[in-house]
Curated annotation (Swiss-Prot):
Record text on subunit structure and interactions: Component of box C/D small nucleolar ribonucleoprotein (snoRNP) particles. It is associated with the U3, U8 and U13 small nuclear RNAs.
GO BP annotations, alphabetical order: methylation; rRNA processing
Catalysed reactions, semicolon-separated: L-glutaminyl-[histone H2A] + S-adenosyl-L-methionine = N(5)-methyl-L-glutaminyl-[histone H2A] + S-adenosyl-L-homocysteine + H(+)
InterPro entries linked to this entry: Fibrillarin (IPR000692), Fibrillarin_CS (IPR020813), SAM-dependent_MTases_sf (IPR029063)
Listed Pfam families: Fibrillarin
Native source species: Leishmania major
Any one GO CC term of the record: ribonucleoprotein complex
Similarity section: Belongs to the methyltransferase superfamily. Fibrillarin family.
Domain of life of the organism encoding this protein: Eukaryota
Protein name (Swiss-Prot/TrEMBL): rRNA 2'-O-methyltransferase fibrillarin
Record PTM Asymmetric dimethylarginine, positions in chain: R2, R7, R12, R16, R19, R24, R28, R32, R36, R40, R44, R48, R52
Amino acid sequence: MRGGFGRGGGGRGGSRGGRGGFGRGGGRGGGRGGGRGGGRGGGRGGGRGGGRGGAGAKVIVEPHMLHPGVFISKAKTDSLCTLNMVPGISVYGEKRIELGATQGGDDKKEYRLWNPYRSKLASAIYAGVSSIHMGPGSKVLYLGGATGTTVSHVSDLVGPEGMVYAVEFSHRVGRDLVEMSKRRPIVPIVEDARYPMKYRMLVPMVDCIFMDVAQPDQARILALNAQAFLQNGGHYVISIKANCIDSTLEAPVVIASELNKLKKDKLKPLEQVSLEPFERDHAVVVGVYRPVKKSKQ
């Protein structure tokens, strides 16, 4: 469930987490969505795989009440999905739902199911985070792009008017991002996120930074990139894996320490959610960089 920033900094998002729903934006559930998958990445490519759903059963797709660009597929179980920018093509073997004019549209639309066991951003939405700050037209710097599972969904969110700048250290994995960028608004950057000046000519000022880099110094990496690319009042979303930072301490203690580091670098935390049951000892923190003070009228 949504955690706060009460005593101890770790908030209530700690170990309980609950099964999560869709926050205030829809029904329960979502099920397991096809197994645990593989952390950030998932398998390569996917090509035209994945298959289409909704052929026999009645499926209704509704916009999420809290997150622009995110939809809820209502069938036997409710699932998150995004509007596929490239209809007919699956990125990582995900299921697709094709709907026609029966829901009031003139053209057919295709939605891609968003599996919370393969995307920490999706699991944060299931857990009830109130905003991810990646709506249509947004410019997003994505640190830790991996094979592009979540990157592809973020590109659906920002749409053709937005852009995703995806940084990934691995050259082998980066090839998948390069291939994906041929069809989606993605700028693939194969570099080390610790050195943002190496890609300063490729990234403009952005509206939001999403970070999924499991490193002990991830708070410092986020701060360096925020100083280089995040506009004042811009937002960040960071996935914190406690065991990767300090496996000798309890997860809430580690997360509280990371929050303090963020605050020192003017990265003010706004909310925190636990990713249970999708990920153990993980939390997602949403915050704002150098918040702009509202002028008094």
